[in-house]
Amino acid sequence: MVLLGVGCGRQHEIIGSREVSVAYLWGLAHEGSTQIKEDLVLRGYVTLNDVLGESSRSFVVSDESGGLEVKLDAANIFTFLPLGSEVAIHCSGLYIGREGGTLALGLRPTSVYAVDRIPLEQMLNYIVVGEYVSDCLQPTLIAIGDMDYDDMFRYVMVEDVWLVEEERGLLWCDVDATTGEYISSVRHFTDGRDTLAIVTAPTAIYAGWKVPHYRARCIGVVDIDKNMVALRLSNHQITPMEE
């Protein structure tokens, strides 16, 4: 097997393996867990990690067909899997599982979860990281009304949205009245027609920041919260629309 460094417009050369897309792996997955026995390789870009606490012990890899979550038993994943880095995942021996409408890749499950996390010491058995962080990773522009369950973990951009009036002044995360700790919370943005739910993990470093109320451009991955389609910001990419 030969693996070459990757930059914009360049790819790993993989010999003896069949390259597949995220959509192909979605097609393999059934409710619960499915072992991957073929010599398959998934190539994509890291579109969500723990650099700002937006995920924990996992990262999202996306390609043009969609995205999936890779379960990894490690902290500070961003130090070796930075946003935009290209990865080649050798899937043989891994398990793919559906979890609440999303797709996860990991090891054989030993508990109630669809897959177990890959131990850090085993990561290099499955995951090869390209030499370069891509400067050509671009989200897919999508309208709120077009976002649905088929877009799970797709890396997307929503433009010209603003926080609904009744949520102005709120923080990204609510505080639990009993423990005083932040809890996973949803804030709602609108484009004047449809409403976008943005879900924030309590581990995000901006959990205690006020949600901006300017007309914004939001970039992240499509996720599910309480069985509803939502957006999870990637690297807190919410910026004002240019005048």
Q: Which residues are covered by each model-predicted region?
A:
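Sec-dependent bacterial lipoprotein signal peptides
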Residues: M1-G7
